[in-house]
């Protein structure tokens, strides 16, 4: 350095909050660019065709029955490939269901499984305190499976991160679709939930999308509780159940994707729930975390019960997610859970699969991805796992209605 050169000023340290704001902005912009390339804002999410075997499984009939209907000119006309393979759209599958319900009904089976007189709206809260448990993946595939099997379903995204909404074609950073907060808020701007519900690309499945605005409920509720001139805050735990009562007749099942923390949103969802599904990754740290979650949850719900807001459930279950059966420690942890909780653990597990994670890259579920886009064995193994889990949950829902399980 030249002796006459001016001294170089030391670099100013960057404040942590400035650094994370800069990096958060960078991530958002890059992800937004990728999202725009894969799913432009004016794009509409479409749904693939379903193969004959898939349609037969979702309808609960044999493939030969569907072939016979086609040959007799009954029901919607399937799309036929150059190789002669038949496939149906989800809308056509719904038409087939209606046709079978009218012309193929037996005492053993109703092809349209809508609620009957005296059967209660089923509200399934999907919860976990720890991220990475497959909570949103579970909620999305369950809601879609129930719609594909003929139920009228409302999915409610209560997680401000809005992953469930993204999987259904909503882009919270662009769409600004109203969230459930609009039906929960304590001021005179509260709206009916019917104004917030949006259709999805799955016939029979609607959604209440999420956005960061939901976080406002966590701040508003303590203020409302301290307001001596109103009782609204003191009965905050009734707000979701009251909102859902406005659309009670429109749906058979509501699937709520709860946020991954024990805040007012989660508590309000649990007091509205008729059943709870706790997702758990079978690793020691995850199970330990879940144990703490259960202790905290029980401690919070007890005083709420004492003021008349008991959580009255038809059922609750633990679902093992992202399971690798060949992993010895995971298999041991599954055995540990089954020994401890017996019938409270679902018999079927959601297997870890690259098929599910690969679909997530393009903001799709496995029910949206075409088999030809993946290794066939990987796809089928993941699909069999998902269908087995979801079918078991549907049986629990139907049992809550007092229906006999039809194999």
From Swiss-Prot:
GO terms of biological process kind: DNA replication; regulation of DNA-templated transcription
CDD domains (UniProt xref): ParAB_family (cd02042)
One Pfam entry name: AAA_31
SUPFAM superfamilies per the UniProt record, alphabetical: P-loop containing nucleoside triphosphate hydrolases, Putative DNA-binding domain
Keywords: DNA replication, Plasmid
Keyword Iron recorded: no
Recorded coiled-coil stretches: none
GO molecular function list: DNA binding
UniProt family annotation: Belongs to the ParA family.
Protein name: Putative replication protein A
């Amino acid at each position: 350095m030249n002796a006459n050169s001016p001294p170089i000023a030391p670099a100013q340290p960057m404040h942590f909050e400035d650094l994370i704001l800069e990096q958060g902005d960078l991530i958002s912009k890059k992800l937004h660019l990728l999202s725009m390339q894969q799913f432009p804002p004016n794009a509409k999410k479409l749904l693939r065709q379903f193969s004959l075997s898939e349609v037969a499984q979702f309808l609960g009939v044999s493939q030969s029955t569907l072939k016979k209907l086609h040959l007799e000119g009954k029901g919607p006309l399937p799309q036929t490939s150059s190789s002669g393979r038949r496939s149906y759209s989800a809308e056509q599958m719904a038409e087939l269901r209606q046709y079978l319900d009218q012309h193929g009904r037996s005492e053993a089976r109703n092809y349209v499984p809508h609620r009957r007189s005296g059967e209660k709206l089923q509200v399934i809260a999907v919860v976990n305190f720890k991220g990475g448990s497959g909570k949103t993946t579970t909620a999305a595939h369950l809601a879609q499976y129930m719609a594909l099997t003929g139920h009228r379903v409302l999915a409610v995204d209560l997680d401000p991160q809005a992953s469930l909404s993204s999987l259904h074609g909503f882009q919270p950073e662009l769409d600004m679709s109203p969230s459930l907060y609009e039906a929960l808020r304590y001021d005179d701007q509260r709206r009916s939930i019917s104004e917030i519900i949006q259709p999805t690309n799955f016939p029979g499945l609607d959604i209440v999308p999420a956005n960061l605005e939901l976080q406002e409920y966590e701040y508003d509720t303590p203020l409302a509780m301290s307001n001596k001139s109103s009782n609204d805050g003191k009965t905050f735990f009734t707000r979701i159940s009251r909102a859902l009562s406005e659309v009670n007749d429109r749906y058979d099942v509501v699937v709520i994707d709860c946020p991954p923390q024990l805040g007012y949103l989660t508590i309000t969802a649990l007091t509205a729930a008729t059943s709870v599904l706790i997702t758990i990754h079978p690793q020691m740290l995850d199970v330990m975390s879940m144990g703490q979650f259960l202790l905290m949850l029980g401690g919070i719900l007890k005083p709420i019960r004492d003021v008349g807001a008991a959580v009255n459930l038809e059922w609750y279950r633990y679902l093992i997610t992202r399971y690798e059966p060949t992993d010895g420690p995971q298999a041991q942890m599954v055995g540990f859970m089954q020994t401890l909780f017996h019938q409270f653990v679902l018999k079927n597990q959601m297997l870890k699969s690259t098929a599910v994670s690969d679909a997530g890259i393009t903001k799709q579920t496995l029910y949206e991805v075409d088999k030809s886009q993946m290794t066939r064995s990987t796809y089928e193994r993941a699909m069999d796992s998902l269908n087995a889990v979801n079918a078991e949950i549907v049986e629990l829902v139907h049992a809550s209605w007092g229906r006999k399980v039809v194999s």
